[in-house]
């Protein structure tokens, strides 16, 4: 039964509770808690004063300190949920009194600030009310003070309950999380963006006359102008565009204008994608100059939102990163923001600076303009000093742990691509001890959770809680792993400072224990598991660098089962969509469905790729015994381009200098047809491979302008390089692939002025040149040109049939594929990034007498004894002539002037060799 309270009683209670936190708590306990039934039942028939009194008292009661909220417990959340779902004031927003709307929105802001993830079903009503209020009142300058502050409170609410995280500056995340909208919500977003733009333009127009660049450029006039004819335009002088200066301070004097501008501009950053490109505010030079002037404002919120507005395009627009001039203007103000106190909740200078460094580390790692600018200041040393102070704290609370995590992340970004910062950080001998302790603490927490999993599962079942919160230090340990990954990129650090078995042991333990979590503790829910799977991916990223050829810890990792752990993961349906889930794993499948695992897959393959770099054939077959070729090929069409890239790069290293593995790969792409031999009557197999067709189609699908897709294409090209290096029969298979030759032509034809399709990438060009090189190099002769001259094949001379009866070419272009081929010796593998090259591998293959027997993927064999070197030379000459016919000779000659030194040198060597072959008659 609802207890009725009069207006006077409500006001009396409200006045008695001001400043008394404990008295407020009493109203959440019986019997006083019955008052909430009255307060939540706001009827349309209630008078304005009664509605306002109920809203005021609700606001007073819910305005509790964190300690008092803990005392109240879940009942506080129940009241918030009831306010969201039971009150009907949102649906009648356009009909309500302006003061009632203001108090209601202010109450919602209080609730959203405490529980930002609590769903609010009536948000669309408030958006419609906001749009109507802006268009019908604000733009016509008819707003009362109550309506202005209501607009401000609405903007705050939209920021709090919006589904996007406004502090996320990572471009890939920004694109992935951009919501799919229906036609209705699409229109709603457009109207929201339009209303926000109207607010921004109306307020900014009041202060545009404050833009002043007179102290930068003198404007020459031909005759004096009367004061009445002078119009302030900061772009009257054409030299202004060339200056790096920022205009004088623009001061927003009106506090309502200041709040409206900062909140509207911040929210506009979320909806601006709805505005056509030519109408966006950031494309308006005058408005951009206005925002630059706001960087010097007295209002911290204005300065912070100006920074966000100016920096966001670097993460959301393709070519904006090239504008380093503007970035150099903004960076000092971003650095200065570290001293702002207090900072608005939606602004994190650590995250912004870290995201900028990461962005340029990916695009221009050797010339990061952010680090270059910071190097001219003492900012980095100040950050390191504060970082050391955080590490020296005897214990951490939630706030200090978050701050320390931010310091670790930004130090990881500093050290990711710059050796001097790695050495600077590693000079602190205690840093690695702190790192090891951070990893050990997380391992202990995981072990404790696994040991208590039965009790925890029972508790979650009884409380009907489907998701547990993540382990409290997940961000902390992830930051340490990122820092370790940055350190491990240094060759000298791997051989000296990081030569600690304990670090490798801790990495393996984290990987193993976290995988056990995914197998046994999936009941904890996605909120718990997502951070742990993210930690798995980062851990594998660090292990990638610890298993490189020159690392002292590679053997330790192998002895302690890194391949076995990866084999378990790659055969798990969670990480391999080609594997079927067992019938008894339905609960696990449902619990973990949708969790992103692409980083784990990509880095697992990357670890194997590094292990297979420059290794013996014996080691390759040991790997394939545990992780067979079929399992590797499961990831060749993965939805994530990064996974595909690592899969092709792994195949590149496996096929290098290994004829057997080349044949295994061809076997996996075989089409076999059985026919009757007309002479003997025996059944024979006619085999062909669709590997090249698959590779050609894959390259056509790839966009080399994307970094990961470019790496995938590079891997494919080097697989073809390795195929062409095996023997004459494999060369013949490659030379017949017209589509692949066309793709190579498209890559080699590009220049700096015409690079629309493939980006004029030097790595892709070099790979194409290596394919051509191996097609034309004699697989069975160590010194091809010397041998040709010794056999009388000097320029202008062609031996007749009488001189050499076996000089005819027996490997035809159009012959059907059949069994058997004459063996050829590998020669001249490229020294590319990950293409392994080992002379001993030739001996390994030569000792395998039965290697080529029954090989289906070769040309029709010549007669016994017809394997003369002249015969092979003839096939090489024919291949060279075909390359000339398709225009590749001209493209090779064109690339001798390429801007890349490696491409120029390879093109010159190849051109010289082709010229020699073309002289053979």
UniProtKB/Swiss-Prot annotation:
SUPFAM superfamilies with a match to the protein in the record: ARM repeat
Gene null: resulting phenotype: Negatively affects glycogen accumulation.
Record localization: Nucleus; Cytoplasm
Composition bias type Acidic residues, residue spans: 829-855
UniProt-listed GO biological process terms: ascospore formation; negative regulation of gluconeogenesis; proteasome-mediated ubiquitin-dependent protein catabolic process; protein catabolic process in the vacuole
Keywords (A to Z) from UniProt: Cytoplasm, Nucleus, Phosphoprotein, Repeat, Ubl conjugation pathway
SUBUNIT field: Identified in the GID/CTLH complex. In the absence of stress, the complex exists as an inactive anticipatory complex (GID(Ant)), composed of VID30/GID1, the E3 ubiquitin-ligase RMD5/GID2, VID28/GID5, GID8, and the RING-like subunit FYV10/GID9, awaiting a substrate receptor to form the active E3 ligase complex. When cells are shifted to glucose-containing medium, the substrate receptor VID24/GID4 is induced and becomes part of the complex, named GID(SR4).
Family statement: Belongs to the VID28/GID5 family.
Protein name: GID complex subunit 5
Annotated gene: VID28
């Amino acid at each position: 039964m609802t207890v009725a309270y009069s207006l006077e009683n409500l006001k009396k209670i409200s006045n008695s509770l001001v400043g008394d936190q404990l008295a407020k708590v009493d109203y959440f306990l019986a019997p006083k808690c019955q008052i909430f039934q009255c307060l939540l039942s706001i009827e349309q028939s209630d008078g304005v004063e009664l509605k306002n009194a109920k809203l005021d008292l609700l606001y007073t009661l819910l305005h509790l300190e964190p300690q008092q909220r803990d005392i109240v417990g879940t009942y506080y959340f129940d009241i918030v949920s009831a306010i969201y779902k039971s009150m009907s004031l949102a649906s009648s927003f356009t009909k309500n009194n302006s003061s009632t709307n203001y108090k209601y929105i202010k109450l919602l802001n209080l609730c959203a600030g405490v529980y930002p993830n609590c769903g609010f079903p009536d948000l669309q009503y408030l958006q419609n009310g906001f749009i109507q209020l802006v268009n019908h009142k604000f733009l016509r300058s008819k707003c009362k003070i109550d309506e202005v502050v209501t607009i401000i409170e609405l903007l705050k609410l939209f920021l709090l309950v919006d589904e996007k995280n406004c502090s996320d500056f990572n471009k890939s995340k920004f694109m992935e999380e951009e919501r799919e909208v229906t036609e209705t919500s699409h229109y709603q977003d457009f109207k929201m963006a339009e209303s926000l733009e109207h607010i921004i333009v109306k307020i900014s127009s009041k202060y545009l006359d404050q833009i002043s660049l007179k102290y930068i450029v003198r404007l020459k006039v031909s005759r004096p102008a009367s004061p009445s004819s002078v119009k302030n335009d900061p772009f009257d002088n054409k030299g202004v565009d060339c200056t790096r200066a920022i205009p004088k301070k623009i001061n927003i004097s009106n506090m309502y204008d200041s709040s409206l501008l900062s909140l509207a501009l911040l929210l506009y950053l979320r909806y601006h994608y709805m505005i056509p490109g030519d109408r966006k505010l950031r494309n308006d030079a005058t408005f951009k100059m206005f925002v630059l002037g706001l960087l010097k404002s007295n209002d911290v919120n204005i300065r912070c939102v100006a920074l966000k507005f100016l920096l966001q395009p670097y993460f959301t627009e393709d070519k904006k990163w090239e504008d380093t001039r503007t970035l150099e203007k903004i960076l000092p103000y971003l650095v200065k923001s570290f001293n702002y106190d207090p900072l608005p909740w939606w602004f994190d200078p650590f995250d912004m600076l870290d995201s900028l460094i990461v962005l340029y580390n990916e695009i221009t790692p050797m010339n990061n303009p952010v680090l270059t600018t910071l190097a001219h200041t003492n900012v980095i040393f100040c950050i390191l000093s504060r970082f050391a102070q955080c590490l020296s704290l005897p214990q951490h609370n939630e706030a200090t742990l978050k701050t320390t995590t931010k310091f670790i992340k930004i130090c990881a970004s500093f050290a990711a691509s710059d050796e001097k910062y790695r050495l600077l950080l590693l000079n602190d001998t205690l840093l690695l001890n702190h790192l090891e302790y951070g990893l050990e603490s997380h391992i202990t927490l995981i072990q404790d959770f696994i040991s208590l999993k039965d009790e925890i599962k029972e508790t979650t079942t009884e409380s009907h809680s489907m998701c547990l919160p993540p382990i409290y230090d997940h961000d902390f340990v992830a930051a340490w792993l990122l820092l370790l990954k940055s350190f491990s990129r240094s060759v000298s650090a791997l051989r000296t400072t990081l030569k600690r078995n304990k670090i490798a042991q801790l990495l393996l333990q984290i990987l193993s224990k976290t995988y056990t979590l995914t197998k046994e503790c999936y009941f904890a829910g996605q909120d718990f598991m997502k951070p742990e799977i993210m930690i798995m991916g980062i851990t594998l990223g660090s292990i990638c660098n610890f298993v490189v050829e020159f690392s002292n810890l590679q053997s330790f990792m192998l002895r302690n089962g890194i391949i076995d752990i990866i084999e378990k993961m790659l055969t798990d349906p969670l990480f391999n969509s080609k594997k079927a889930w067992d019938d008894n794993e339905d609960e696990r499948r449902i619990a973990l469905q949708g969790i992103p695992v692409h980083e784990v897959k990509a880095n697992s393959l990357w670890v194997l790729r590094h292990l297979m770099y420059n290794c013996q054939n014996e080691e390759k077959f040991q790997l394939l015994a545990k992780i067979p070729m079929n399992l590797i090929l499961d990831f060749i069409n993965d939805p994530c381009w990064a996974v595909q890239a690592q899969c092709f790069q792994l195949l590149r290293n496996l096929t290098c200098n290994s004829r057997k593995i080349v044949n295994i790969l061809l076997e996996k792409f075989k089409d076999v047809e059985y026919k009757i031999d007309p002479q003997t009557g025996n059944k024979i197999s006619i085999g062909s491979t669709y590997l090249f067709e698959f590779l050609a189609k894959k390259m056509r699908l790839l966009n080399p302008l994307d970094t990961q897709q470019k790496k995938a294409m590079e891997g494919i090209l080097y697989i073809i390089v390795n195929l062409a290096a095996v023997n004459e029969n494999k060369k013949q298979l490659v030379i017949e692939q017209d589509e692949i030759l066309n793709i190579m032509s498209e890559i080699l034809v590009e220049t700096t002025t015409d690079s629309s399709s493939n980006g004029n990438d030097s790595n892709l060009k070099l790979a194409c040149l290596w394919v051509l090189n191996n097609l034309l190099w004699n697989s069975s002769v160590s010194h091809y040109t010397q041998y040709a001259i010794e056999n009388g094949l000097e320029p202008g001379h062609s031996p007749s049939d009488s001189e050499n009866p076996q000089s005819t070419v027996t490997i035809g272009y159009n012959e059907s594929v059949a069994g058997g081929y004459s063996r050829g010796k590998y020669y001249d593998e490229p020294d590319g990034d990950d293409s392994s090259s080992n002379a001993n591998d030739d001996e390994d293959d030569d000792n395998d007498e039965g290697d080529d027997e029954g090989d289906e993927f070769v040309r029709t064999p010549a007669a016994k004894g017809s394997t003369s070197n002249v015969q092979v030379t003839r096939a090489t000459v024919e291949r060279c002539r075909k390359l000339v016919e398709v225009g590749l000779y001209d493209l090779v000659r064109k690339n001798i002037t390429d801007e890349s030194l490696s491409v120029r040198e390879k093109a010159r060597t190849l051109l010289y060799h082709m010229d020699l072959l073309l002289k053979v008659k």
